[in-house]
Amino acid sequence: MDNLTQKRLNGLRDRLTYIRDIFLGKHADSVKLLQEKLDEFTDKANRGLLQNPYAEESSLEDLFKYVEDRLTKTLTPMEKVRIVRHPQRICLKDILENVYDNFTEVGGQDEHSLDPSMLIARAVIIRRRGKKRYTQSVMVIGQEKGHGAEFRNGGSVKPWGNAKARQFMRVAETEGIPVHTYIFTPGSYPIEDYPGAAQQIARNIYCMAGLRVPVVTVISEGGSGGALAIGLADKRLMLSVGY
């Protein structure tokens, strides 16, 4: 089995695990079918019995996509919550790497740099219109879950992280560039140390209410005050499965 086939098989195994995690025993027949087809393909690949590897692999991919599309149409509210909170869910770094043409992560000063749950980056969007090339710098601010990384606290930001977000909103206003915020949080981190979680969220809201640059927010998981801290925007968007 070549490395490319092995990589794709690992991806299919991850997708099957994801389906099991989301539906928790429901749709057992569909899950069993996917498992059987995946095991059959793996066995043939290991024994070198694939007559047309590309065609058979594409057929297996199509089967996975068909089952996933069918299951997605019957999602319950709790299943949507599991999707939003799953470690394989897209995170802010994935967006930075795949949506923006270039980005540089920046940190705060002193205690404002202590919270890895809040990610700030200067990013660039490049678009072509006819023969002209347009470059737009933006300030990207959002909670980072890191696909379940424990040190990210599940996207629950402490007051220092929200203070860092507020600081760079002001920087964006000074430079006259738009602010893009991404909300991936179940809520603010429950802590009452100075400057206080609720007090810092209030400062952020006050700051955003007066910003003189456009603010666009994209919501995946918008829980409680953690979402409010960076969610006051001129335009709000939500992912197809989000709340």
Feature map (PLM): residue ranges:
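Terminal-region recognition feature
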Residues: 1-217, 221-228, 232-237, 241-243
